[in-house]
């Protein structure tokens, strides 16, 4: 059967007219499937609750930092008894492709937090615009986020596009997760507040956890990578001096996608991995935050990404998280940290920020 379909497809694509017919049929079939698997469950949910709320753009990809953000958002919504419907980014793109993005119009929309406003991840920013434009009658919250635009001709042009669309919406609220993004967002958008990264609302310290051992190296390898090969070699040299061969590499981005059902299981595995280490060495934002919430000693390597240092300011008072600008300080900082026996993570100082966010959501939920 597969061979027959392939043969038909090849014949169709050799003819311009047949190709158009084939693509049209494929689109119709895709739209029917989209309506069955995505649209109908949304319609059913909308009928089942008095106040529909949509948590959207959540991950199904491999980045555990993004999953931890979504997980914390889910916990927050549970704490304020808000019944929500989750739509992942993958499903959102499908809804958009088949013209169903406005199915959310008129209802409360919560856009997943992270570091994706602006042009660092342009496809995400463009989808944010589409969501805002397609749902003019919704109240929309963009949960704690970082923003970045290059000071180039293209960066300035894209910023202007976003400013027009964002500021044209009558009920859009934005939350910045660090001061630099907050100041910039306040200068270009209305209704902006400062709230920490959502993962800082979690506390994953376990007093009775197993004995810690060795060093866990968690470094970036994507477009936000800033360490050179020589700098990585220098880091490894210092780790060898302190730990010998008792170290291993890890990452907050796995080698496989993570479904919403797998989210908590995979996060628990990663938190356990962090808890079992004496020291984390990272240039990843959520490498640092996972270390903080699990009470794990951590050396944070400076990055050209402002969100890392910006978010560090929230936890700079934690004696077990050290931010270094100069690799020559690595060994000294490492030995100081290893003298720590038990670390405690107290996130009560963030309560007023998260309570403010909850209050804002509840206000819209009850209206």
Question: How would you describe each model-predicted region?
Answer:
Residues 2-367:
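Active-site anion-handling motifs in enzyme catalytic cores
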């Amino acid at each position: 059967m597969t061979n027959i379909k392939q043969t038909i497809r090849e014949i169709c694509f050799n003819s311009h007219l047949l190709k158009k017919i084939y693509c049209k049929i494929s689109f119709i079939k895709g739209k029917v499937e989209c309506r069955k698997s995505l649209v109908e469950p949304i319609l059913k949910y909308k009928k089942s609750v008095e106040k529909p709320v949509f948590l959207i753009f959540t991950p199904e990809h491999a980045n555990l930092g993004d999953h931890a953000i979504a997980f914390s958002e889910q916990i927050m919504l549970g704490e304020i008894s808000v019944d929500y419907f989750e739509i992942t980014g993958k499903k959102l793109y499908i809804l958009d492709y088949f013209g169903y993005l406005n199915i959310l119009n008129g209802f409360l929309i919560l856009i997943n937090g992270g570091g994706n406003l602006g042009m660092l991840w342009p496809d995400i920013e463009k989808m944010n615009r589409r969501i805002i434009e397609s749902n003019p009658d919704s109240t929309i919250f963009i949960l704690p986020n970082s923003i970045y635009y290059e000071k180039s001709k293209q960066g300035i042009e894209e910023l202007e596009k976003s400013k027009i669309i964002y500021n044209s919406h009558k009920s859009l609220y934005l939350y910045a997760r660090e001061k630099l993004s907050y100041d910039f967002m306040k200068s270009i958008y209305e209704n902006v507040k400062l709230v920490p990264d959502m993962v800082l609302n979690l506390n994953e310290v376990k007093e009775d956890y197993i004995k810690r051992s060795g060093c866990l190296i968690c470094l970036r390898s994507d477009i936000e990578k800033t360490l050179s090969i020589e700098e990585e070699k220098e880091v490894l040299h210092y780790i060898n001096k302190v730990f010998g061969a008792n170290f291993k590499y890890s990452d907050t981005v796995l080698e496989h996608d993570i479904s919403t059902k797998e989210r908590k299981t995979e996060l628990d595995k990663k938190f356990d991995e962090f808890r079992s280490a004496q020291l984390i060495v990272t240039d990843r934002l959520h490498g640092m935050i996972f270390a903080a919430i699990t009470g794990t000693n951590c050396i944070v390597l400076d990055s050209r990404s402002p969100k890392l240092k910006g978010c560090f300011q929230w936890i700079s008072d934690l004696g077990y998280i050290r931010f270094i600008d100069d690799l020559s300080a690595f060994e000294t900082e490492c030995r100081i940290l290893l003298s720590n026996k038990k670390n405690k993570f107290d996130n009560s100082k963030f309560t007023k920020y998260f309570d403010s966010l909850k209050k804002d959501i509840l206000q819209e939920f009850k209206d």
